[in-house]
């Protein structure tokens, strides 16, 4: 089968969740199908990144976005009641480029990621499957609820436009996929139960307990792209609300915040002597391996948290919130600990750091859980079956 994959970002390096998902889906699908990759990108894609995908793609086409035209499109969408981010990714240049590439490839099926790319492919004559990835409108709504002033107004506008786009997707595509049941239920359509659940997986060969050997320099680690609003919110909440309660009982407890592109507000958290902000890490496994406990106090966002899958695969005891655990489906008190306020999170952290036997039990149980439920080969299987079914109609 000839699959044309359409992405809003080049899927390498793997510092963002959408890139990680797309990369591993491409790797798995390429074992049995021909992959043609079309990406729009507002950043220069390095030759090294292209080469990382080359073994899995018959052809790769990257269309560089003009930021000035993107900005003009955002303004245009504001005044025409359309999603701002969809305007950013869908300029006349990107639409012409996609149509030309589609004519060249003549695929059996088009598979695009996120509503951001919907305007590129919605009118294609070929069978089409779109991956919502997660409920982007729900993510935006959660951010809106915690914002103030002009930004609250902008997010409220974008929330309404994304809800409309998610609803309209049912009219344009032969099938739709999403990362979790919770995200599917948040899509505003009476047929949201027909969306195919395609979870993420974890690379067990890469993320394994003995993958790297480094000293345990930190007690706690939180990893993620530190320019992404849900991660920024979680990091600040951890340092400003949770850690003071932990330090009241364990004054010497140390915390590592690891991940690409930290915002200024994240760098400032490192002014506390017991908090280290690393920025980009060449091998994120070293951040996990250098710490005793993984904590992800997610307050906003949507979808399945890859960082939790990776930490559990590295056999780390984990603490998170219900928001992150509902898509994951782990058992509180067995495979990880869940807390939805600073006091409960702090109690779990102190218990795990003070009780080696408990920490080991949670780590071992979580490790078994991800191995039994989150391999990439199993995760991509329902997607492959869906693509085959759409082509066979």
Segments predicted by a language model, with ranges:
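Donor nucleotide-sugar binding/catalytic pocket of nucleotide-sugar-dependent glycosyltransferases
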Residues: 137, 155-209
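Short hydrophobic beta-strand element within catalytic cores of glycosyltransferases
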Residues: 307-310, 317-321
């Amino acid at each position: 089968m000839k699959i044309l994959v359409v992405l809003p970002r080049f899927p390498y390096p793997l510092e963002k969740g959408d890139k990680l998902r797309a990369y591993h889906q491409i790797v798995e699908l390429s074992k049995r199908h021909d992959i043609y990759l079309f990406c729009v990108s507002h950043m220069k894609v390095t030759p090294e990144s292209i080469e990382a995908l080359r073994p899995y793609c018959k052809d790769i086409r990257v269309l560089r976005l003009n930021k000035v035209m993107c900005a003009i499109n955002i303004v245009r969408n504001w005044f025409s009641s359309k999603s701002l981010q969809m305007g950013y990714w869908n300029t006349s240049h990107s639409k012409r480029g996609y149509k030309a590439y589609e004519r060249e490839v003549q695929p059996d099926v088009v598979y695009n990621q996120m509503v951001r790319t919907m305007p590129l492919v919605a009118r294609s004559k070929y069978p089409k499957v779109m991956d919502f990835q997660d409920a982007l409108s729900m993510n935006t709504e959660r951010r809106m609820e915690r914002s103030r002033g002009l930004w609250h107004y902008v997010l409220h506008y974008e929330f309404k436009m994304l809800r409309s786009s998610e609803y309209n997707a049912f009219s344009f595509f032969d099938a739709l996929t999403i990362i979790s049941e919770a995200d599917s239920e948040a899509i505003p359509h009476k047929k949201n139960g027909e969306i195919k659940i395609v979870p993420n997986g974890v690379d067990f060969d890469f993320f394994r307990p003995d993958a790297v050997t480094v000293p345990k320099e930190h007690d706690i680690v939180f990893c993620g792209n530190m320019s992404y609003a849900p991660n920024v919110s979680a990091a600040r909440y951890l340092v400003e609300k949770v850690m003071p309660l932990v330090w009241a009982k364990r004054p010497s407890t140390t915390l590592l915040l690891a991940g690409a592109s930290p915002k200024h507000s994240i760098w400032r958290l490192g002014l506390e002597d017991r908090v280290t902000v690393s920025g980009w890490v060449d091998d994120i496994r070293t951040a996990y391996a250098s710490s005793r406990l993984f904590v992800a106090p997610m307050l906003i966002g949507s979808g399945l948290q890859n960082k939790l899958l990776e930490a559990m695969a590295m056999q780390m005891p984990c603490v998170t919130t219900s928001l992150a655990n509902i898509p994951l489906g782990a058992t509180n008190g067995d495979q990880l600990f869940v807390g939805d306020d600073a006091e409960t999170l702090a109690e779990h952290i102190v218990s795990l750091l003070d009780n080696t036997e408990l920490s080991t039990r949670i780590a071992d149980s979580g490790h078994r859980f991800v191995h039994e439920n989150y391999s990439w080969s199993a995760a991509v299987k329902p997607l492959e079956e869906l693509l085959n079914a759409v082509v066979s109609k």
